[in-house]
């Protein structure tokens, strides 16, 4: 196996482990054991635990951005609800690791925070890029710096609501949650 393929395999295993473990629980030792290789080989590919964690988090964020990619849906609110559904599914399937990633990003690690913020920025930017001039504008939501700021706030609220909903749905169905969150963006932006 080529070095690039082996590194890719280890990153994939790391992101799989992140779905059921916290970032702190994914050590070089755990990954080496799961992969059936020596710790030294892992250090060869990642240098140290921090570099490994950064690579795994970057890969997890890339996967999240990829799975929430827009579908070919003309109605911008429906499109947003579908993307939010993919996001919700990702959080459900990777709850432990996702919450760990959010906490690590809000902690003292600048590199993890940067990766997390880049992912969030990509998701918010996509709302405006994908919907284009006939999308959010069709809802009466212009693409302005002020609206982008409010969209950032909506994104943070959406993340908090989804993480809480996974633990306790508070009597709100999945569909209702997605529709309310999608509808909240224009409501917040136009308030």
Give names to the regions the model predicted:
Residues 9, 13, 17-51, 55:
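Helix-turn-helix
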Residues 13-17, 90, 126:
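Short amphipathic alpha-helical elements of helix-turn-helix/winged-helix folds
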Residues 1-5, 139:
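N-terminal intrinsically disordered/low-complexity leader segments
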Residues 55, 69-95, 137, 143-154, ...:
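Hydrophobic alpha-helical connector segments
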Residues 65, 110-137, 145-156, 160, ...:
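Amphipathic alpha-helical packing segments from all-alpha helical-bundle domains
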Residues 7, 28, 50, 54, ...:
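Short, structured helix-loop boundary elements
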Residues 58-64:
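Short, basic, alpha-helical segments at the C-terminal edge of helix-turn-helix-like DNA-binding modules
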Residues 92-114, 128, 160-167:
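Amphipathic alpha-helical segments used for helix-helix packing
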